[in-house]
Structures are given as structure tokens and as C-alpha cells.
Regions:
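Amphipathic alpha-helical interface elements
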Residues: 1-206
Length: 206
């Protein structure tokens, strides 16, 4: 059972060890399928994260300035409020880990959880309530659409975190059905075409 030597998480490890005693071959196959599907999903989520991150950054560079992340945590910055304090701290922490960080460095260092957070009501409103413009759907009923996107994005984030922590994905009952590619396709194509001319560094995913 060499595959048990890898870091698969305590939940998986206990199940695999118990089942392997009874059904060694079948258990091995199930675990391999789980890992293969987890890897496939992880690659899809990585691609989605890059697409969403770059679209948000391009949008806010147009509206808030080329260095909007640094500006957002200054004395009069959009995130320097009680409601957005946690977002401000995330940017400060990311900045403190990089020597003389550029805007691109900060963008690359922030993970999907940060970009999803920007759709929360306080962060969304602090930046001018324009972030849904990165998507192509009808922009009527702004509040309902924002809430719907928060739900969908958090499901994708939850799946990302389960995979990152080596938890069950394929064989976990009650896992939500996610349409990652559908959400990705909803990002405005005109903006994605512009992004090709102003491509941020494609790094920073953990």
C-alpha cells in the first residue's frame, strides 16, 4: 500500500486503511480514481482562479487606478473601514511577505478566497458596486445577482479547499454540483481579450 505514504489527509487515510483490509484491490482502484478526479478538478479550478483574478484586477485597474490594491489600504483607501478590515489585513499580510512588492506581485500572491471576498456586500459596495461588470449576464437586479454569484463562487472555493486539504471529493455524499466552466464562460469576453494585451503574471496559486 505504497500510496498510503503520501499526504492524503486523516479522513481519507482512516477510510482507506479500514477498507483495504477487506477489499484491497477495489480500494486501491477507488483511491486512484479519487486522486485522478481531484487532480482534474484542481486544474480546472486553477484555470478558473487565474481567469477570475485577472478579470477583477483589470476591472479595478480601470476604475480605481493601476495600483488599486496598495491604494485600497491607505488612510483614505476603500478597504480602510471597519467593515472591510479583514480584507485590508489580507492585503497587508501579502505585502509584508514580499520585498518591495509591485502591484503585479500582490495580485499574484492573493488566493481565490481573496478574490471571492471582493463580491461580499461591504467590499463590493466599497469599490463602487461595479464588479459584476466582469460578467456578461444582464446587470439588472444587482443585489440578487451579487448574492447568487457569491453562493456559486463560495462553492467553487469550498471544493478548492477540500482538494487542497486532501479531503474526499468524488466519493463524498452531498457534494454540490459545480459548473466551473459555466461561471468562467460568463466572464466578459471583451475584457478577456483586453487582458491578453495586459497579462498579469500567471503565478501565485497555492
Amino acid at each position: 500500500m505504497e500510496f498510503l505514504n503520501t499526504d492524503i489527509g486523516s479522513e481519507k487515510r482512516a477510510w482507506v486503511q479500514n477498507m483495504a483490509a477487506l477489499h484491497r484491490v477495489e480500494t486501491h482502484k477507488l483511491v486512484l480514481i479519487e486522486w485522478q478526479e481531484s487532480a482534474r478538478l484542481w486544474n480546472s479550478i486553477r484555470a478558473f482562479e487565474l481567469t477570475l483574478r485577472n478579470a477583477i484586477d483589470f476591472h479595478y485597474r480601470e476604475r480605481l487606478g493601476q495600483n488599486w490594491l496598495i491604494a485600497s489600504i491607505e488612510r483614505d483607501g476603500v478597504f480602510n473601514t471597519v467593515q472591510c478590515r479583514s480584507t485590508l489585513e489580507l492585503i497587508k499580510t501579502a505585502s509584508s511577505r514580499i520585498k518591495n512588492p509591485s502591484h503585479s506581485d500582490l495580485v499574484a500572491s492573493l488566493t481565490l478566497s481573496f478574490w471571492v471576498r471582493l463580491f461580499e456586500v461591504h467590499q463590493f459596495e466599497a469599490c463602487g458596486s461595479t464588479l459584476l461588470e466582469v460578467f456578461t449576464e444582464d446587470r439588472t437586479n444587482l443585489s440578487a445577482r451579487r448574492k447568487a454569484y457569491v453562493v456559486r463562487l463560495k462553492k467553487i472555493l469550498g471544493l478548492r479547499n477540500r482538494i487542497a486539504h486532501h479531503e474526499w471529493v468524488v466519493y463524498r455524499s452531498g457534494m454540490p454540483k459545480l459548473k466551473i466552466t459555466k461561471v468562467c464562460r460568463e466572464i466578459d469576453r471583451e475584457r478577456l481579450n483586453l487582458l491578453k494585451k495586459h497579462r498579469p503574471p500567471a503565478v501565485g496559486l497555492s
